[in-house]
Amino acid sequence: MSVLDAAEIMDLIPNRYPILFMDKVDELNPGESIVCTKNVTINEEFFQGHFPGNPVMPGVLIIESLAQAASILILKTEKYQGKTAYLGAIDSAKFRKVVRPGDVLKLHVTMEKQRDNMGKVKCEAKVEDKVACSAELTFIVPDPKKKI
């Protein structure tokens, strides 16, 4: 059973197909941690060119998946509700395992620091409990009345 389904996810973040990279939220502790699921299918548009005959999910899209999970965690925190979270920086990104069609990508995000309109999260994307990607992401949640 999911905590948030696809429709509820789309109520929180602005991403839509083909750039929405999560199917459901499995666990959510606002302000602390989140676990989400992305079912990776052969129907993903990026597999047409990455790579024909050897489909592999691009690492940058795994990072984007983690950033979307982080956005949900951030935006479910009371002070950020109704706003948009933006990716500000990627640190210590490591790719350890390829992600292929048929894999279930589990996105684990933990809040590390938070202050004013920014913060840092620690992330891991796992397939069958093996780390495919890890990174630290910095986020910014600007005042919606100000242009960034």
UniProtKB/Swiss-Prot annotation:
Family annotation (Gene3D superfamilies): Hotdog Thioesterase
InterPro entries for this protein: FabA_FabZ, FabZ, HotDog_dom_sf
Species whose genome carries this gene: Lactobacillus helveticus (strain DPC 4571)
NCBIfam families linked: fabZ, PRK00006.1
Protein name: 3-hydroxyacyl-[acyl-carrier-protein] dehydratase FabZ
GO cellular component: cytoplasm; membrane
Keywords: Cytoplasm, Lipid A biosynthesis, Lipid biosynthesis, Lipid metabolism, Lyase
Enzyme Commission code(s) on record: 4.2.1.59
SUPFAM superfamilies linked to this entry: Thioesterase/thiol ester dehydrase-isomerase
Active site location: 50
Gene name linked to the record: fabZ
Location of the protein in the cell: Cytoplasm
Source organism superkingdom: Bacteria
Any one Gene Ontology BP term: fatty acid biosynthetic process
Family membership: Belongs to the thioester dehydratase family. FabZ subfamily.
MF terms in GO: (3R)-hydroxyacyl-[acyl-carrier-protein] dehydratase activity
Reactions this protein catalyses: a (3R)-hydroxyacyl-[ACP] = a (2E)-enoyl-[ACP] + H2O
Function: Involved in unsaturated fatty acids biosynthesis. Catalyzes the dehydration of short chain beta-hydroxyacyl-ACPs and long chain saturated and unsaturated beta-hydroxyacyl-ACPs.
Pfam families per UniProt: FabA (PF07977)
